[in-house]
């Protein structure tokens, strides 16, 4: 014969230990209050951070930054081809970045390390794409346009009998 069911099952609640943590409170009964507190605290921290930054900026005053002039035409009257990274000057015109300026005037360049093999270089070879300094062993010349490329920017085409190094500009047009 089966056991008879408890006549008080619907009336008596289950007596289980329930652990209520911060997570249950923030998702359940107190969800609205906790989310409002978090929102207010976040907003207050953002405004305090922005105010501290602005106070720091205004305390320094307005400093005038002297940037190099835009490139002037050479003696032939035609500007040099703009290859590699260019920057927008304060007047809105494009200016050469430091790597291209040092390529044009190598007299003020200090001895630095090669970006590929970390050997000391004299600063004359600079990648035409990313403007990293290169030593003599790491210089790769593009088969298409003849520009200098580093090991990261130079793509090696092994489809022919001989390997061809292509810069990223020329690699777009090769099929």
Curated annotation (Swiss-Prot):
Region of interest: Interaction with BCL2L1 isoform Bcl-x(L) and inhibition of BCL2L1 anti-apoptotic activity: 36-55
UniProt region (Interaction with coxsackievirus B3 VP2), positions on chain: 105-123
Positions bearing Phosphotyrosine: 34
InterPro entries: Siva
Pfam families (alphabetical): Siva
Tissues in which the protein is found: Ubiquitous. Mostly expressed in thymus, testis, ovary, prostate, small intestine and spleen and less in colon.
Source superkingdom: Eukaryota
Keyword NAD: no
Outcome following mutation: residue 53 to F: No effect on phosphorylation or apoptotic activity
Keywords: Apoptosis, Cytoplasm, Host-virus interaction, Metal-binding, Nucleus, Pharmaceutical, Phosphoprotein, Zinc
Modified residues (Phosphoserine): 70
Entry keyword Metal-binding: yes
A single BP term in Gene Ontology: T cell receptor signaling pathway
A single cellular component GO annotation: nucleoplasm
Changes after translation: Phosphorylated by ABL2/ARG in response to oxidative stress.
Transmembrane segments: none
Subcellular location: Cytoplasm; Nucleus
GO MF annotation terms: CD27 receptor binding; metal ion binding; tumor necrosis factor receptor binding; virus receptor activity; zinc ion binding
Subunit structure, as described in the record: Binds through its N-terminal region to the C-terminus of CD27 and to PXMP2/PMP22. Binds to the C-terminus of TNFRSF18/GITR. Isoform 1 binds to BCL2L1/BCLX isoform Bcl-x(L) but not to BAX. (Microbial infection) Interacts with coxsackievirus B3 capsid protein VP2; this interaction inhibits the binding of SIVA1 to CD27.
Function: Induces CD27-mediated apoptosis. Inhibits BCL2L1 isoform Bcl-x(L) anti-apoptotic activity. Inhibits activation of NF-kappa-B and promotes T-cell receptor-mediated apoptosis.
Protein name: Apoptosis regulatory protein Siva
Taxonomic source organism: Homo sapiens
Encoding gene per record: SIVA1
């Amino acid at each position: 014969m089966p056991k008879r069911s408890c006549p008080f099952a619907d009336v008596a609640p289950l007596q289980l230990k329930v652990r209520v943590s911060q997570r249950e409170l923030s998702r359940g009964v107190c969800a609205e209050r906790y989310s409002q507190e978090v929102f207010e605290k976040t907003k207050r921290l953002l405004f305090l951070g922005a105010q501290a930054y602005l106070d720091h900026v205004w305390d320094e005053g307005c400093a005038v930054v002297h940037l190099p002039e835009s490139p002037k035409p050479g003696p032939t009257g035609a500007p040099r081809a703009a290859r590699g990274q260019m920057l927008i000057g304060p007047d809105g015109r494009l200016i050469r970045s430091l790597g291209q300026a040092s390529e044009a005037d190598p007299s003020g360049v200090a001895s630095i390390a090669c970006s590929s093999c970390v050997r000391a270089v004299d600063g004359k070879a600079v990648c035409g794409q990313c403007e990293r300094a290169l030593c003599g062993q790491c210089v790769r010349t593009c088969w298409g346009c003849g520009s200098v490329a580093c090991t990261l920017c130079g793509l090696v085409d092994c489809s022919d009998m001989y390997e061809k190094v292509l810069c990223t500009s020329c690699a777009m047009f090769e099929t």
